[in-house]
């Protein structure tokens, strides 16, 4: 077994106090996202999306956040993917944003709701053409005999859609994750980290400090 117990560091970038918190957690999330982008972090919109299968086995993968507002967090994916199939059976999910250089993380619990075709199409048309074509190529989560199969399919579809717009695949969609709770974590000295959780009760958010 590889021993990693000596790998540690102190957290000293500042704390998080109750007086710092807005009543709406999305306002704090927007501030932290802006600061993550301003700090030029690598992939600040990357989030871990966790789902479970019919046996309760959890699965995680990194997905890019594409939009957020007071209603929740939006991402897009292949509807034949493992995550989409698991969401169809159980739409309870969690999201995690790891902003390590800022000594921050945000954890979200909520339910995923499928977006309308109009909403998906609006985003799909903003993607680079090669990315649109790639959406047609991959049967996400299916087994491949070799990478060449995937690349061959890509060039085949690229020739097919050489002229004009790339249509939206019927098997490509998106989700809005409506949060029921959002936790903000800020690293603190001596491992006395600051954690605050917002829990939704009807239309209001209740705020509590959690022990680190």
From Swiss-Prot:
A Pfam family matched in the record: PNP_phzG_C
Annotated substrate binding sites: 8-11, 66, 123, 127, 131, 191-193
One biological process term in Gene Ontology: pyridoxine biosynthetic process
Keywords, ordered alphabetically: Flavoprotein, FMN, Oxidoreductase, Pyridoxine biosynthesis
Keyword Repeat: no
Pathway the protein acts in: Cofactor metabolism; pyridoxal 5'-phosphate salvage; pyridoxal 5'-phosphate from pyridoxamine 5'-phosphate: step 1/1; Cofactor metabolism; pyridoxal 5'-phosphate salvage; pyridoxal 5'-phosphate from pyridoxine 5'-phosphate: step 1/1
Catalytic activity: pyridoxamine 5'-phosphate + O2 + H2O = pyridoxal 5'-phosphate + H2O2 + NH4(+); pyridoxine 5'-phosphate + O2 = pyridoxal 5'-phosphate + H2O2
Cofactor list: FMN
UniProt: FMN binding residues: 61-66, 76-77, 82-83, 105, 140-141, 185, 195
EC number: 1.4.3.5
Cofactor binding note from Swiss-Prot or TrEMBL: Binds 1 FMN per subunit.
InterPro entries named among the record's database cross-references: Pyridox_Oxase (IPR000659), Pyridox_Oxase_CS (IPR019740), Pyridox_Oxase_N (IPR011576), Pyridoxamine_oxidase_dimer_C (IPR019576), Split_barrel_FMN-bd (IPR012349)
GO molecular function, one term: pyridoxamine phosphate oxidase activity
Role of this protein: Catalyzes the oxidation of either pyridoxine 5'-phosphate (PNP) or pyridoxamine 5'-phosphate (PMP) into pyridoxal 5'-phosphate (PLP).
Family listed: Belongs to the pyridoxamine 5'-phosphate oxidase family.
NCBIfam families: pdxH (TIGR00558), PRK05679.1 (NF004231)
Subunit: Homodimer.
Protein's name in the database: Pyridoxine/pyridoxamine 5'-phosphate oxidase
Lineage: Bacteria, Pseudomonadati, Pseudomonadota, Gammaproteobacteria, Alteromonadales
């Amino acid at each position: 077994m590889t021993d990693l117990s000596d790998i540690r560091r102190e957290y000293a970038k500042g704390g998080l106090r109750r007086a710092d918190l807005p009543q709406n957690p999305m306002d704090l999330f927007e501030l932290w996202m802006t600061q993550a982008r301003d700090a030029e972090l690598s992939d600040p919109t990357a989030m871990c999306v966790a789902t479970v299968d019919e046996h309760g086995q959890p699965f995680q993968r990194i997905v890019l956040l594409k939009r957020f507002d007071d209603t929740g967090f939006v991402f897009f994916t292949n509807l034949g993917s493992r995550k989409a199939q698991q969401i169809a059976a159980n739409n309870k999910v969690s999201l995690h944003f790891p902003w390590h250089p800022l000594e921050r993380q945000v954890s979200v619990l909520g339910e995923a709701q499928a977006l309308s075709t109009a909403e998906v199409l609006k985003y799909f048309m903003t993607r680079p053409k090669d990315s649109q074509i790639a959406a047609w190529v991959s049967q996400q989560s299916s087994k491949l005999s070799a990478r060449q199969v995937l690349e061959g399919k890509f060039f085949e579809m690229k020739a097919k859609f050489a002229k004009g717009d790339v249509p939206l695949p019927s098997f490509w969609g998106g989700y809005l994750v409506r949060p029921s709770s959002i936790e903000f974590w800020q690293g603190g000295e001596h491992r006395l980290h600051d954690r605050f959780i917002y829990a939704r009760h009807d239309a209001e958010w209740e705020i509590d400090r959690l022990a680190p």
